[in-house]
Structure formats: structure tokens, C-alpha cells
Amino acid sequence: MMFMVKIITRKVKDIEPLENALLIEGLPGIGHVGRLAAEHLVHEFKGEKFLELFCYDFPPQVLVKDDGTIEYMCAEFYAIREPKPMIVVLGNTQALSPIGQYHLAEEIVKIGIEYGANFVYTLGGFGVGKLCEEVKVYGATTSKELAKKLKEHDILFRTDGGGIVGAAGLMLMFADLNGIPGICLMGETPGYLIDPNAAKAVLEKFCKLENIEINMEELEKRAKGMEQFIEKIKKFEEEMLKAAQAKPPSEEDLRYIG
């Protein structure tokens, strides 16, 4: 028995299809790396929202904003015309179930093609479980020719196999099935923090691959703020460890020794 997941789209603005556009996915994932990178593209290149997508496999809730109004769980499509045509997909969630992930990825690629996309980029994080002094960027692609191009830009490939979960992986599959090339870029991240530094590393590789320039000042500010936050955590942990080591055992502690 085949289960269908209902997806609703709502046009925010009528736009003409772009020509030879890049479809760029930046939905939430590990360290919010892809989302931060894609949001930065939209912000810096004045992206224009033209479509919203709602999926019945999104979390069954709405978010409440500071002013008391609600925010839907949805994906949003933005059109960028300069420095080159792009369709950027942002959102506050991904689908919850495997079947929902498949339907969502397929629909996003379908919409991208409808609006002129002929190349797909998916952006995300590569969880390593620890802080990274220098962020490495890993990649995956739909062809050997593109893999060679990634290597020329010092983008690494996993040597232990593994998979890419969610929209970042499935959109490459649906792009390939539709005869469209695609690349996934993943920045190393601890996985337990929102990571603007990894987003910056991913965006730098993207810009080199596409031969475009972008102002990174805003991301650099966020990365600096996160570094300061991490330093505070480290300092607090060190102080706690020193205090624990310096504290003599109490009588109660001694009762349990030997």
C-alpha cells in the first residue's frame, strides 16, 4: 500500500521562470549549517520570496512569535537574479518520516525545474562531534566530472562511505533522475551548536565553484560571537574541573572509600 503525503503550495508573488538557475537547498539540519549559508545568500543578494510550501508531514504545530502571532511550519522559495539566477529554499523544518522526506525532496526539485533551475546545490553540516579549529568541507555529487571539479577546489570526500540524510541527499537523487546535475556541500561541525563558522566555510566553497563574490561580514560577526560563547563554556568547564580537583573529600565521601 502506497502512502501519499499531502503538500500544499501558495504563491506569494507571480514571477517569470529564471534562466539556467541554481536551485539551492538550505533547510534545517546538523548545526543549521545549510540554513545559515542559504539565509546569507538571500540576505546579501536581496532574494524575493515567491512561494511557500506546506507539508502534512511537517511537525504538527505552529510557532509562536514574540509579538504573539503564529509562524507556520513551512518551506519558502526565494528568487535571486544577480549575480546569477538562483532559487533558494529556506524553511524552519524538514519532513518527519522517510516517506515525507521523499515526497518533499521530489516536490522541491519539481518546483525548482518549473521555475528554471538546471543545477542543484544542497548545503548542510558534517557532524564530527567536536569543535573544529579549521573547518573542512566535504562534498558529494551526481557525476564523476563534477567530483573532479570538487577535488580541484580542495573539497573532500568521505572515505568510510556513509550517507546523506534528508533533503540534502534526496534532492541530489531527484535532480539526477530528472537529468539535472547536483552537488552537496557539507561543513564540518560539532553538531550540537548552531555553527556560522561552518556555514561560512561552505559558502566560500560555493562561491569559488560558481565564481561569484559575496560579503561575509554578517556571517563573520555571528561566527565571532559563537567563538566567544564557546570560550566562555570552556573557561567555565575548566573552573569547575579545578574546583572539583581542589576540593578535599568530605567525611561523607570518606565513608564510601575502601
From Swiss-Prot:
Topology relative to the membrane: Single-pass membrane protein
Keywords assigned by UniProt, alphabetized: Membrane, Transmembrane, Transmembrane helix
Superkingdom of origin organism: Archaea
Principal cellular location given in the protein's record: membrane
Localization: Membrane
InterPro entries: MJ1210-like, Proteasome_assmbl_chaperone_2, PSMG2_sf
Transmembrane spans: 163-187
Protein name in UniProt: Uncharacterized protein MJ1210
Species in which this protein is naturally found: Methanocaldococcus jannaschii (strain ATCC 43067 / DSM 2661 / JAL-1 / JCM 10045 / NBRC 100440) (Methanococcus jannaschii)
